[in-house]
Amino acid sequence: MNELSNLSLESIERARERIEEHVFRTPLTTSRSLTELTGTQVSLKLEHYQRTGSFKLRGATNAILQLSPSDRARGVIAASTGNHGRALSYAAKAVGSRATICMSDLVPENKVSEIRKLGATVRIVGSSQDDAQVEVERLVAEEGLSMIPPFDHPHIIAGQRTVGLEIVEAMPDVAMVLLPLSGGGLAAGVAAAVKALRPHARIIGVTMDRGAAMKASIEAGHPVQVKEYRSLADSLGGGIGMANAWTFQMCRALLDDVVLVNEGEIAAGIRHAYEHERQILEGAGAVGIAALLSGKVAARGGSVGVVLSGQNIDMGLHREVINGVVRATEED
């Protein structure tokens, strides 16, 4: 087990102090509808209220603030499915650095556009996160840019851990946390923080049922590659990296379960958030709600926290989902 999971609560506090001028402490609100549905208090952690519309700003900010002035001056670079790129672009602009974001052609145009608005250089490369990562590594070697990975880095995970700390502070009796699972930065960070304070709390990762790289890797016992598909939960796409050094070990050790939801269930989560919670969520942000609505996670044994991780959905697509239209996605 990697030593990162055993970092002290003081280290989480240092990360929180480091980023507090740049990120919001997001609300944790009770969901009346989900509480009535499950018979258990369900509270929603509104991470989509962050300045860039997702939790990713925490880790990106924590990482860039620990670079030397000379490294910041040369610039930062990352591969991204959208939200990390937007967060890193925002954080770079805030400290006077420049960002280059490499993405595949699966990233929705609305996310690409928002990154460009923040002044970042955008490179669209290939049809997978792995293709984008190859371009990142090329530019690191050629231009001396500092790579800020989207999830598999101790500074990123430490920033995301502050979400877990805030959940426990706001809900001391938390018995279960549901959160989106992709590369594992959020899941590893939140799980480590919550279990440090509430060892018996269950942490459930939720992801889409097509191209679930972390689940496949946990089942195999080592990182594996999976095919990427278009999905309502587009920001959960991409692999975990065959040389994954941090999040795979932590997720395998700290997650109590990983649950898969399909496109229809993700759409139902988006609709529920809008109609009953008055929240606009992207697909990845709604997977925890989807898991409860579908009955794939039974909320019992105490209070449940659900992390709503992001809101950066194309509004045309959001209207289609609210109106009951689920776009067909590629099967091969």
From Swiss-Prot:
By its UniProt entry, which CDD domains does this protein fall under?
A: Thr-dehyd (cd01562)
Does the keyword section mention Lyase?
yes
Q: State the reactions this protein catalyses.
A: L-threonine = 2-oxobutanoate + NH4(+)
Instruction: Tell me which cofactor or cofactors this protein depends on.
Output: pyridoxal 5'-phosphate
> What does the record give as its pathway?
Amino-acid biosynthesis; L-isoleucine biosynthesis; 2-oxobutanoate from L-threonine: step 1/1
Give the enzyme's EC designation.
4.3.1.19
Gene Ontology biological process terms in this record: isoleucine biosynthetic process; L-serine catabolic process; threonine catabolic process
Q: What class of enzyme is it?
A: lyase
Is Amino-acid biosynthesis found in the keyword set?
A: yes
Q: Which residues carry this modification: N6-(pyridoxal phosphate)lysine?
A: 56
By its UniProt entry, which Pfam families does this protein fall under?
PALP
The alphabetical list of record keywords is: Amino-acid biosynthesis, Branched-chain amino acid biosynthesis, Isoleucine biosynthesis, Lyase, Plasmid, Pyridoxal phosphate
Q: Name one GO molecular function term.
A: pyridoxal phosphate binding
Matches recorded under PANTHER family = L-THREONINE DEHYDRATASE CATABOLIC TDCB, THREONINE DEHYDRATASE, MITOCHONDRIAL-RELATED
**Protein family per UniProt:** Belongs to the serine/threonine dehydratase family.
Name used for this protein in its record: Putative threonine dehydratase
Taxonomic lineage: Bacteria, Pseudomonadati, Pseudomonadota, Alphaproteobacteria, Hyphomicrobiales
